[in-house]
Design a protein with these regions (language model features):
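Long, compositionally biased, intrinsically disordered segments
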Residues: 2-252
Length: 252
């Protein structure tokens, strides 16, 4: 059975220096707790992983050891920000209670100016639910190319339907790359995005758009406008990109 990376929006940056606002990208994935479950509700684990600018979003080794939430600093609005339903809400998202987006501190590098956090939440959904949820905001670190205010929208589509080939619930494929990435200036670089599917399906990358069945998947950083001229993105999850100027940042 073929599948596409439709459920996961992976956002990453290509970087030479670090400065500016606090968000560096992230991923949202989900999996069925018991693929052979019968009846409702169906338990689903949603995992959010985000990368932030170190110094503005706090993480320490002690916080990692204590499984503490990241320190949001002046960005206290994050405490009231949730992974809200953004499409097919209501009858197609029965039982969904949106989790908060503030993650537990998992990794930190002062040298790379990066804080990474992750959280997993279990939600109980109804059979045949099919909806999209997203983390939306507008505090990207300074980017070279973007539209509007440089907002982001990291979305995931959650579908609670059994497969026709084996009668089990399907799990979402995942992309496991985190930002930021470094690329050399004026040299074409091939980036292969790591992807996996726990059901063993053949998967491809469908790159995000601003209006996929009514869902904004990328905000102000939708490709190709967010990338340098002559960047090529392929459905096999490969990007060929050339950084034109030292210090440029791009998002996809």
């Amino acid at each position: 059975m073929k599948s596409t990376v439709f459920f996961v929006l992976m956002v990453f940056e290509l970087i030479n220096t670090a400065s500016g606002s606090h968000f560096l990208g992230g991923t949202i994935t989900w999996r069925i707790v018991n693929a052979s479950a019968t009846g409702s509700p169906v338990s689903v684990v949603i995992t959010q992983t985000y990368s932030w600018l170190y110094g503005l979003i706090t993480c320490t080794n002690a916080m990692i050891a204590g499984s503490q939430l990241i320190g949001v600093g002046v960005f206290t609005n994050l405490y009231s920000t949730y992974l809200n339903c953004v499409a097919n809400c209501g009858n197609d998202s029965r039982g969904y209670i949106a989790p908060n987006v503030v993650p537990h501190c998992t990794d930190v590098s002062a040298y790379l100016s990066t804080t990474i956090g992750q959280r997993s939440d279990t939600v109980n959904l109804e059979v045949d639910d099919d909806f999209a949820a997203a983390f939306k905001s507008n505090a990207w670190r300074t980017l070279t190319l973007f539209t509007g205010t440089g907002s982001w929208s990291i979305s995931t589509r959650i579908t609670i339907k059994k497969r026709s080939d084996n009668g089990l619930y399907n799990n979402a494929p995942v992309a496991t790359m985190m930002s930021p990435l470094n690329i050399p200036v004026l040299k074409p670089t091939i980036i292969n995005v790591p992807i996996a599917d726990m059901d063993g399906d053949i998967i491809r990358c469908r790159w995000s758009t601003s209006n996929t069945t009514g869902v904004d998947e990328c905000g102000g950083v939708c490709p190709p406008d967010s990338l340098p001229i002559n960047t090529v993105i392929y459905p096999n999850c490969t990007i060929i990109i050339t950084g034109p100027v030292v210090g440029n940042w791009f998002a996809v």
